[in-house]
Amino acid sequence: MGVLENLWDDVVAGPRPEAGGRGHLRRISTSLTSLNNTTEGMSVAGSVSLPASPATPVTPGSGRKVDVWRSVFHPASNVTTREIGANVFDKPSHPNSPTVYDWMYSNETRSKHR
């Protein structure tokens, strides 16, 4: 085994047991004292510091959040389509013209896979 394999094995799984074969699992110590002992010999060049998290950017006038689902479930609440909503979307153009539901559930467009 090469040096890297030994180093990887020692770092990840801990030192090899003195007795027992390869079939035995090694217990990994997760206590803080064992972690402190392993990092004593290590030094870091330079300091690592994270900047403070920036505040969430706010544009002027964006105090109220827009609920996108409100315009879907309550079409009259959408300011841009309030005027035309009832005339265009809710009423058919001709008295006997088919609606979306008529088209969806007609024999031509109904799913054959049942």
UniProtKB/Swiss-Prot annotation:
Signal peptide: none annotated. InterPro entries: DRM/ARP. Residues 87-114 are annotated as: Disordered. It holds the Pfam family Auxin_repressed. Disulfide bonds: none annotated. PANTHER family: DORMANCY-ASSOCIATED PROTEIN 1, DORMANCY-ASSOCIATED PROTEIN HOMOLOG 2. Belongs to the DRM1/ARP family. This is Dormancy-associated protein homolog 2. The lineage of its organism: Eukaryota, Viridiplantae, Streptophyta, Embryophyta, Tracheophyta.
